[in-house]
Amino acid sequence: MNDRGVPNSRTGPSLLALLPAANSYAAAYSPANRRAVGVGGGSYKSPTRGSPGTRGGWKAPLCLTLIGGIDGTVAALPPPAVYSLTFSGLGEPPQGAPRRGGGGADAGERTERGSTANKKKRQRGVLSPPSALGSSPAGRGRPAPAIAAAKSSPLSASAAPGRCGARPRAPSRATRERRPRGNPRAPLRRGARGRRRSHTRGPARTTVGAVEPRAGLCE
């Protein structure tokens, strides 16, 4: 550069010629104008989740910008990604943008609904308290052995009030809901005899192994 401020052809463009280009880059990639469409030469908006380089902001144009010097020389400026350290607005994610990896819980955090331990406990019937009747809801688990033995015993069946004339049936393994062997997560299925027919109008059918009430207890 000579004394008059005009750059020589050997040294290339002066710093005064680079200032307008730097100002245009700063205005184009500021946070206020980042959402505008078509800002800057060849810039385009990134996807919603962004890429590792831009983090959800504007991607830098891939082409070089040519600037004409005062004395006719031509200089090439690199893409605006070089100016990310100079201009603070470049490379920051927009306000309200989700974090990388999707929304919801943070990385490494497990929600209670998706916990595997809770699913196993529900299948075993640990989380649901046993009911007073002895049968667990929705076929989860089996009734307590003490309650099941009390229901199937002849003394308790005959001594119960209002059950003198009824014929108690012994619990059948075919009608009990069970899971197939070897697969604890298989859906519950009924026995080989099918569903219980509680809507039939005929007399009560006797089951093999039914316990008859003892004479003399219900009078």
Curated annotation (Swiss-Prot):
Residues 36-57, 88-219 are annotated as: Disordered. Keywords: Signal. Residues 176-202 have a biased composition (Basic residues). It comes from the Viruses. Residues 1-26 form the signal peptide. Residues 127-173 have a biased composition (Low complexity). This is Uncharacterized gene 1 protein. The gene is MDV001.
